[in-house]
Amino acid sequence: MQARVKWVEGLTFLGESASGHQILMDGNSGDKAPSPMEMVLMAAGGCSAIDVVSILQKGRQDVVDCEVKLTSERREEAPRLFTHINLHFIVTGRDLKDAAVARAVDLSAEKYCSVALMLEKAVNITHSYEVVAA
C-alpha cells in the first residue's frame, strides 16, 4: 500500500491514496478538515463497520443501516496518544437477530478489522452495539 501527503497551506495537508482518492487533514484542531487523530478514529470505525455489514449480509440478515459512534480518551501530555476507544454500533434492520449482530461485532474486533487490531496493540479498545428494528 502506498499514499502521499502534500502540504496545502498553514497546517492543512492533502492526502492521496494509491487508488486516487483524496482527503484533507488539518493540524489546527480540525479548523478546515479532520485532524490526523480524528482520521485514525474514523478509520477504525469505518473498517469495523464494513466488516459488520459484510458479515451480516453474508449471514442473510436484512440490514438497512449501520452507524458507529466512536468515543475516545487521549493522554493529556504529548504525545497525545489514544488510551481508550469505544466503538458503539447502531445496527438497523428487519428481523435482525441480536446474536448475529453480536457475532459480527466480535468477528470484526477479534479477526477482521486491521485498523482496530493494529491499534489494539497500544490502545484499550472496547465494542458495544444496539439493534434497532426498521
From Swiss-Prot:
Q: Which InterPro entries match?
A: KH_dom-like_a/b (IPR015946), OsmC/Ohr_fam (IPR003718), OsmC/Ohrsf (IPR036102)
Protein name per Swiss-Prot or TrEMBL: Protein YhfA
Q: Which Pfam families match?
A: OsmC (PF02566)
